[in-house]
């Protein structure tokens, strides 16, 4: 099956168009071979396949493929008809009414019904999917059918991608190591008083010992990677608005995983008095009442750490001599709503991360990524001395945004770093604890960032998740500093005492 559009519609006329029947017939015949083929390969333009006249209308059926789509074709015809009928016959075109709009899209996999505006019905048919749209003149002019088609094709491509096994490719793996420690590090840390659960799901309070480990990881990243490679520290916002996520592309699918932010409708104390009074009397927080008094979500808590940075450079032009731009942020927590039950520090809703971002030409971005890979290998082999591997994967946004072709070229994509967790057993699932992503022109285009020379800008990012580093290191080395690699132990120094309780 090929992509097919079928539109049944009519032009509303100011008078009976019958006197102009011959002129209309000639116009449609001519348009099928000229007007409706412009911009399309030979034989792939749109066509008027049927038409008839009514007292106050010109009814027609249009068919097309991917080129000169029917909703574009009908506006081309409107302009020609208005000129032809207006001059000679004094008949005006008052608007367009749509009777049916059907798109047939080739697909190898069935899809669930899309629950979005303007879709009247969706059916899985032999060889593809059939959509019936409920659109009018305004929606066609605003290219709503194109956006619906793009959404559907992205979902088809993502379904095909999900059926493949090739989106995880092993690049390198360290030789197997002996791991005497076999405990779950989270349980061991809790038992030794290194950390306790916070009051919110997926949240931990880190004691002095755990905090020392985190700060040592940060120091290693600063001294062994960020400073030698010339990265400058910034502070990124941790409340992210819809505007940012729309530009970054996250607005296409982030909703199940973010913590939403809703501001008060007003700061007027009188407006909130009944909430405060309710608590004073009942000693319960009236969450339903609060829900009535807060505004709609303005965005959410930091999810992926780098998008807010891009508002700093949005709409700007970078001088040639200023690239590559290399920055990092370690100023606060990120938040991600994790599914399932209770997890350890390897899977949390609130976590600490150093986010590394770089911008430059394609060649510069690829070079920066290689530099990071080299420094990470040094850290994981020579300082932490862990058993790990790295694999090339395709990130979620590419499957979601129809960018899989770029990933297959092996330039745009993500390299995941994974480590074994001995307590899970020899056949247990490895944990992804680090990544390096090359995002192509996704962010510079989304935030309208340009280069003085006019050359295309690319970007990359890499997140250092401190909880994941701790989960991996402590799972393999345990909590006893005597069993840690000497290089790491020297950087930690004397471990602080924990807080004692009776």
From Swiss-Prot:
It catalyses: tRNA(Ser) + L-serine + ATP = L-seryl-tRNA(Ser) + AMP + diphosphate + H(+); tRNA(Sec) + L-serine + ATP = L-seryl-tRNA(Sec) + AMP + diphosphate + H(+). Keywords: Aminoacyl-tRNA synthetase, ATP-binding, Cytoplasm, Ligase, Magnesium, Metal-binding, Nucleotide-binding, Protein biosynthesis, Zinc. It comes from the Archaea. Its main location: cytoplasm. ATP binds at residues 336-338, 347-348, 432, 468. GO terms for molecular function: ATP binding; serine-tRNA ligase activity; zinc ion binding. It is found in: Cytoplasm. This is Type-2 serine--tRNA ligase. It comes from Methanosarcina barkeri (strain Fusaro / DSM 804). The lineage of its organism: Archaea, Methanobacteriati, Methanobacteriota, Stenosarchaea group, Methanomicrobia.
